[in-house]
Amino acid sequence: MKLLSKIMIIALATSMLQACNGPGGMNKQGTGTLLGGAGGALLGSQFGKGKGQLVGVGVGALLGAVLGGQIGAGMDEQDRRLAELTSQRALETAPSGSNVEWRNPDNGNYGYVTPNKTYRNSTGQYCREYTQTVVIGGKQQKAYGNACRQPDGQWQVVN
């Protein structure tokens, strides 16, 4: 629990600093960095024990912050909304290996979700491996993960 508290303090401090960015508050890159760092730290905390776990948190936070900042620098709210809706649709209905694309006509950014292997986790939930690809300003970024179907029908990323 102490580790989670430290992560929350870092996330809160970062968001407070980002709020000082000016009248608009937190920008897209700051938001991406914050969310990527927090997600990376949380993922990193799942590995190792003691000092090894702290190393995992640090590495996860750093990698997540870098990737999140790069993606957030170019993605706007509409991009994120389109990507999330497409992810939900792809995970629920698309056959493994098929690409389900989204495209923002206002800025030309686009991406696609490729669901892969479907399996049941230890609690019986349906889960899927997937690849998320986004192209922002002509630069492609890929992320790999797993998501599980929740009782309400929504898919939640588990790593």
Swiss-Prot record:
GO terms for cellular component: cell outer membrane. Pfam families: 17kDa_Anti_2 (PF16998), Rick_17kDa_Anti (PF05433). Belongs to the rickettsiale 17 kDa surface antigen family. It comes from Rickettsia conorii (strain ATCC VR-613 / Malish 7). Its main location: membrane. It comes from the Bacteria. A lipid is attached at C20 (S-diacylglycerol cysteine). The gene is omp. This is 17 kDa surface antigen. Keywords: Cell outer membrane, Lipoprotein, Membrane, Palmitate, Signal. It is a lipid-anchor. Transmembrane segments: none annotated. InterPro entries: Anti_2 (IPR032635), Gly_zipper_2TM_dom (IPR008816), Surface_antigen_Rickettsia (IPR016364). A lipid is attached at C20 (N-palmitoyl cysteine). Residues 1-19 form the signal peptide. It is found in: Cell outer membrane. The keyword Kinase does not apply.
